[in-house]
């Protein structure tokens, strides 16, 4: 489990740089109406994006409710699909329709199953990802992962979760060590 988690947040085969970037120095991905959240890592500026996969009828795609891809800031800022290994071991998601709820899916990261999330359309018909932050399902907006690459196998120093309370819309934050 720990090994899978390390794979998820380090993806050694794509590390471009060992230079650490403070959280505030990372580029902010361009806004998108379908944006759920994104992940950035201390290893480089490349960003994994998680967007809701909305059909023309304004519902979530039941076969793939979330589209995951890179923005390669460390290269030329181009958009790039995840490769098979990244999709199935590292950054990919498992999702399953929640019975008796319209446009709602539960899921987890394939590499880290300890925290399950919900992807759904809210009352304003906007896609959101609810993720456990401080023990409560909150709207997840971004994730930052601090990675120590000094050893043979990278280790996760800590993970920061940034989001909003679904009811109050106040900022929420959690930092934890996996």
Residues of each region from the PLM?
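Extracytoplasmic electrostatic interaction patches
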Residues: 114-178
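Serine/threonine-rich low-complexity intrinsically disordered regions
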Residues: 1, 20-22, 29, 51, ...
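Arginine residue identity/basic-tract feature
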Residues: 3, 25, 35, 41, ...
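Mature extracytoplasmic domains of secretory-pathway proteins
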Residues: 66-138
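Bacterial Sec-dependent N-terminal signal peptides
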Residues: 1-25
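N-terminal export/targeting and maturation segments
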Residues: 18-84, 171
């Amino acid at each position: 489990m720990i090994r899978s988690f390390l794979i998820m947040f380090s993806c050694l085969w794509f590390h471009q740089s060992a230079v650490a970037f403070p959280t505030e120095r990372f580029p902010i991905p361009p806004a998108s109406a379908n944006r759920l959240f994104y992940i950035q890592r201390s290893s480089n500026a490349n960003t994994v994006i998680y967007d809701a996969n909305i059909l023309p009828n304004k519902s979530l795609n039941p076969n793939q409710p979330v589209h995951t891809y890179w923005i390669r800031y460390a290269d030329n800022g181009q958009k790039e699909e995840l490769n098979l290994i990244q999709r199935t071991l590292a950054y990919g998601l498992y999702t399953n329709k929640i019975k008796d709820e319209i446009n709602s899916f539960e899921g987890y990261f394939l590499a880290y199953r300890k925290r399950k999330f919900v992807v759904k359309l809210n009352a304003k018909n906007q896609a959101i990802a609810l993720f456990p932050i401080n023990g409560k399902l909150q709207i997840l907006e971004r994730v930052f992962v601090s990675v120590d690459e000094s050893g043979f196998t990278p280790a996760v120093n800590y993970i920061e979760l940034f989001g909003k309370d679904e009811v109050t819309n106040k900022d929420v934050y959690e930092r934890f060590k996996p």
